UniProtKB/Swiss-Prot annotation:
GO terms for molecular function: identical protein binding; threonine-type endopeptidase activity. Keywords: Autocatalytic cleavage, Disease variant, Hydrolase, Protease, Threonine protease, Zymogen. This is Threonine aspartase 1. It comes from the Eukaryota. The keyword Nucleotide-binding does not apply. GO terms for biological process: positive regulation of DNA-templated transcription; protein maturation; proteolysis. CDD domains: Taspase1_like. Protease responsible for KMT2A/MLL1 processing and activation. It also activates KMT2D/MLL2. Through substrate activation, it controls the expression of HOXA genes, and the expression of key cell cycle regulators including CCNA1, CCNB1, CCNE1 and CDKN2A. It comes from Homo sapiens (Human). GO terms for cellular component: cytoplasm; cytosol. The gene is TASP1.
Length: 420
């Protein structure tokens, strides 16, 4: 087992306003001061997938992660809910043609796009998800709307509101609730169509020569590198707002050439994402979003496993042990040659301000980590105090074998927190 602990630190203390000299304050200065005070804090960590990210497309992956972070922080600064902020980040990731989510998603065996997405609110513990959804540009928006509608209580005649919808039913529900549809030709990009044609030809050739399943599997894995297109790049984000509320979301187009109707981890409870505020039995608020081979993540319920593990004192060690013992060495995946997946996690807790600080304020201590068994994982992160987002493509160390090795990195930051 190979482990990497290159701490890409995001330590950033809240900036302090400079002292104002005595004298008159203009109306413009007063307005500026008021708008500054009205801005809320928070932190976001996003990923553009665990899979294979070529050097040639590194710039595009990092750029979309930066934009996603900025969208989430803008929401948090405006006082939006953590769920709305994490949704804003995911919408930006879904709209990129370089990610396997929303627009440009992998095509299934019939050449169609079917998307999965889910979101969880750490404060209410409510959850919303869609699976095998076609015709909607941003599946995470439907998942978030399901979550919001579910919080309103029972429907007419005492009916229980749905939290998870699939296929045509999910599409009709979205349209009925004002979410616009999107024609298939808009959702499909030239990149996804070209990849579909290449993969389809290889599949047809394999079937003609009666290639067995294992040979076909190896062909598919190698084609990811040859075509410069990772098929496991589910996208996701985790957020904590200035009050310490957390949220997590995930979105995916699924595996290339998947069977129509297949639903992956991105739509399933405890598998794609998890968020849970601090409580009587939880000293930390935690948020998790996963990526990788959906079937592997489903059978290990990895998102929830990681969240529970993060209640330990040492977050880094807890996540490493979870990836090793609950994922790579999981008895539920004993028949797999390589276990492919990745996670981004954050945990937060309230604590006193820095010891050398003269201000009697509480802060939110936010620890954030990412870990993967795939060859690479692209992440971005940003706090409300940062001028811009930081991005990074994490890779397994030289000589490490994907599916059998673990890379883990992360950092820490402090956010001002209102005292309750």
């Amino acid at each position: 087992m190979t482990m990497e602990k290159g701490m890409s630190s995001g330590e950033g203390l809240p900036s302090r306003s400079s002292q104002v000299s005595a004298g008159k304050i203009t109306a413009k200065e007063l307005e500026t001061k008021q708008s500054y005070k009205e801005k809320r804090g928070g932190f976001v960590l996003v990923h553009a997938g665990a899979g294979y990210h070529s050097e040639s497309k590194a710039k595009e992956y990092k750029h979309v992660c930066k934009r996603a972070c900025q969208k989430a922080i803008e929401k948090l600064q405006a006082g939006a809910l953590a769920t709305d902020a994490v949704t804003a980040a995911l919408v930006e990731l879904e709209d990129s043609p370089f990610t396997n989510a929303g627009m440009g998603s992998n095509l299934n065996l019939l050449g169609e796009i079917e998307c999965d997405a889910s979101i969880m609110d750490g404060k209410s513990l409510n959850f919303g998800a869609v699976g095998a959804l076609s015709g909607i540009k941003n599946p995470v928006s439907v998942a978030n709307r399901l979550l919001c509608e579910g919080q309103k209580g029972k429907l007419s005649a005492g009916r229980i509101p749905p939290c998870f919808l699939v296929g045509e039913g999910a599409y009709r529900w979205a349209v009925d609730h004002g979410i616009p549809s999107c024609p298939p030709n808009i959702m499909t990009t030239r990149f996804s169509l070209a990849a579909f044609k290449r993969n389809k030809r290889k599949l047809e050739l394999a079937e003609r020569v009666d290639t067995d399943f294992m040979q076909l599997k190896k062909r598919r894995q190698s084609s990811e590198k040859e075509n410069d297109s990772g098929t496991l790049d589910t996208v996701g984000a985790v957020v904590v707002d200035h009050e310490g509320n957390v949220a997590a979301a995930v979105s995916s187009g699924g595996l290339a050439l998947k069977h129509p109707g297949r639903v992956g981890q991105a739509a399933l409870y405890g598998c794609g994402c998890w968020a849970e505020n601090t409580g009587a039995h939880n000293p930390y608020s935690t948020a998790v979003s996963t990526s990788g081979c959906g079937e592997h993540l489903v059978r290990t319920i990895l998102a929830r496993e990681c969240s529970h593990a993060l209640q330990a004192e040492d977050a880094h060690q807890a996540l490493l042990e979870t990836m090793q013992n609950k994922f790579i060495s999981s008895p539920f995946l004993a028949s797999e040659d390589g276990v492919l997946g990745g996670v981004i996690v954050l945990r937060s807790c309230r604590c006193s301000a820095e010891p050398d600080s003269s201000q009697n304020k509480q802060t939110l201590l936010v620890e954030f980590l990412w870990s993967h068994t795939t060859e690479s994982m692209c992440v971005g992160y940003m706090s409300a105090q940062d001028g811009k987002a930081k991005t990074h493509i994490s890779r397994l160390p030289p000589g490490a074998v994907a599916g059998q090795s673990v890379a883990i990195e992360g950092g820490v930051c402090r956010l001002e927190s209102p005292v309750n």
